[in-house]
Amino acid sequence: MSQDTVAPALPDAPREVVLVTGISGSGKSVALHALEDAGFYCVDNLPPELLPQFLRLEQARTDGAMRRIAVAVDVRSARSLPALLPSLSQLGSEGVKVRAIFLDASTHALVRRFSETRRRHPLSTGAPGEALDQHRALTDAIELERELLADLREASTVLDTSQLRAAQLRAWVRQLVQAPAGALTLVFESFAFKHGVPLDADLVYDVRVLPNPHYIDELRPLTGRDAPVADYLQQQPEVGEMLGQIEAFLVRWLPAFEQDQRAYLTVAIGCTGGQHRSVYFVEQLARRFRDRGATLVRHRELDAL
């Protein structure tokens, strides 16, 4: 189906369609299994141009009972991807809740995973339309894949899996699909700068300039979730000042992000170890914005323990 072709309306369309895509090695199979466990009917590697026809067939086959469907596509369908975004827009105009999740990871993490599994990258022996004997290095294949999927990434909710175990990824995917569709969901994420800035961050705040509970013996083994750490940080004037300024920025600009038709806005707060200050800030911000709509909390370093 070309970009200019619009499929006819789907009779008795599914209630929810989740598209899972992303960089090879980033965890698409794990995410799809998580959706299957959550009650979605899942299809892997469906050619994008067949999505509207597939949904019609499933609705007819199940008498309209198939209400939650997840479809995974990858770079092997690159030549058909231009037709995918118009198809998703068409579904949305028909009242279907459409979510697109794009899994990504750092090149370093991807190279390590391919090395551990000894699998070949799908573009290492040629991109779609290239001769099959055109070999390329793994890092070159990863960068080419990023280029081919750039438009789809821009239109999706991005999830950085670089530091995630499979169990963490499954839990995070379940959280994403449980959040209300159609409204902006705020994601507050703590992280350690020494492990890199999350790839899925929209806004990044650095709280390393604030007093560090790590240097107080009785607070060192605790986290920003614990009352003694929270009490200590609340007593520091600069902590309250920075927290208030971040809150004020979000209050001022959230309406603009909502008008931009974003599904998610990820606010990443970083400190040295991702244990005290960033965790405290995330917990406080999530509490302050909970009444404004859906909020999700993720502590990258703590969740990895």
UniProtKB/Swiss-Prot annotation:
GO MF assignments: ATP binding; GTP binding
Residues that bind ATP: G22, I23, S24, G25, S26, G27, K28, S29
Residues reported to bind GTP: D74, V75, R76, S77
Keyword annotations: ATP-binding, GTP-binding, Nucleotide-binding
UniProt cross-references to InterPro entries, sorted A to Z: P-loop_NTPase, RapZ-like, RapZ-like_N, RapZ_C
Pfam families referenced in this protein's UniProt entry, alphabetically: PapZ_C, RapZ-like_N
Family: Belongs to the RapZ-like family.
Purpose of the protein: Displays ATPase and GTPase activities.
NCBIfam families: PRK05416.1
Entry protein name: Nucleotide-binding protein Mpe_A3336
Species whose genome carries this gene: Methylibium petroleiphilum (strain ATCC BAA-1232 / LMG 22953 / PM1)
